[in-house]
Regions:
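Rossmann-like NAD(P)(H) cofactor-binding subdomain of soluble oxidoreductases
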Residues: 1-36
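NAD(P)-dependent Rossmann-like dehydrogenase/reductase catalytic/cofactor-binding core
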Residues: 56, 66, 115-204
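Internal alpha-helical scaffold of NAD(P)-dependent oxidoreductase catalytic cores
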Residues: 14-21, 34-136
Length: 204
C-alpha cells in the first residue's frame, strides 16, 4: 500500500482503472523495527470505489474479506475518507518524525500537537479547492483517533527516520505544497515540515 492521495491513480496507470479498489488503512499502531512487528490496535481497512463501474471489483474484495475475517469498512464516499487519512498523515507522520518522538508526543499538549493540528488544517482548507470539502468534524475525528493510539507507538515516517530510509514526505507535504501552489494558497506549516524532513534525510 501507498499513503497519500495520488497512490490510487498511480496504481490505475499500471493495472487499469477497473482493477483498483481504493483503500485506506487506519486505526492501527503497528511498529516494525528490524524484523519485529508489534501492535496493540489492529485497525481496519476502509475500502470503496469512486464510480459505479468499479463496483464488481469492490464486491469481490468485500466477499474475500468476509471469508477471511479481515476487519474492514465499506465506504460510500471513499475520496472523502482518502483525504481524511491524508490529512491525518500530513499532521501525525511528519510532526512525529521531525520531533523524533512517538504518538505520545502529539497526544500531550504542546508545540508538536499544535503543529500537527495546524498542518492538518492546511489540508482541510486545500480539500475545499479539490472538491472534497473536509470539515472541522473530520479534523476532530482524526485528532481523537490519535488519542487512542499507544503512546509508545510511532507512525511510519518516524520508523523511516530511525532506519535512515527515505520517507513519504513527497506524498504528504510535497503534495500539499504542489496543490497549494496550484490554487494560490499559503501552507507555511507544511512548507516548514517539508524542508525540515529533507534536511534530516540529507544528514543520513
Amino acid at each position: 500500500m501507498l499513503n497519500g492521495i495520488t497512490s490510487e491513480r498511480l496504481l490505475e496507470q499500471r493495472f487499469g482503472g477497473k482493477n483498483v479498489v481504493y483503500c485506506v488503512a487506519q486505526g492501527m499502531d503497528a511498529v516494525k523495527l528490524g524484523g519485529a512487528l508489534t501492535y496493540t490496535v489492529m485497525g481496519q481497512l476502509c475500502i470503496g470505489v469512486p464510480s459505479a463501474e468499479k463496483l464488481p471489483a469492490l464486491d469481490a474484495v468485500c466477499a474475500l474479506f468476509d471469508r477471511i475475517g479481515m476487519p474492514y469498512s465499506r465506504e460510500d464516499d471513499i475520496l472523502h475518507r482518502l483525504w481524511g487519512k491524508f490529512m491525518l498523515n500530513v499532521g501525525v507522520n511528519q510532526v512525529v518524525m521531525v520531533f523524533e518522538g512517538t504518538y505520545g508526543t502529539i497526544q500531550a499538549p504542546g508545540r508538536p500537537r499544535e503543529m500537527m493540528i495546524a498542518a492538518m488544517r492546511e489540508v482541510l482548507e486545500l480539500s475545499r479547492y479539490e472538491g472534497v470539502k473536509l470539515t472541522e468534524d473530520d479534523l476532530n475525528f482524526y485528532v481523537e483517533l490519535m488519542n487512542t493510539m499507544s503512546p509508545k507507538g510511532m507512525p511510519s515516517m518516524r520508523q523511516d527516520g530511525l532506519a535512515h530510509r527515505r520517507s513519504e514526505v513527497e506524498l504528504f507535504s510535497g503534495t500539499v505544497c504542489r496543490l497549494a501552489r496550484k490554487h494560490g494558497l499559503s501552507v507555511p506549516v507544511n512548507e516548514w515540515l517539508y524542508a525540515r524532513v529533507r534536511e534530516m534525510e540529507a544528514a543520513y
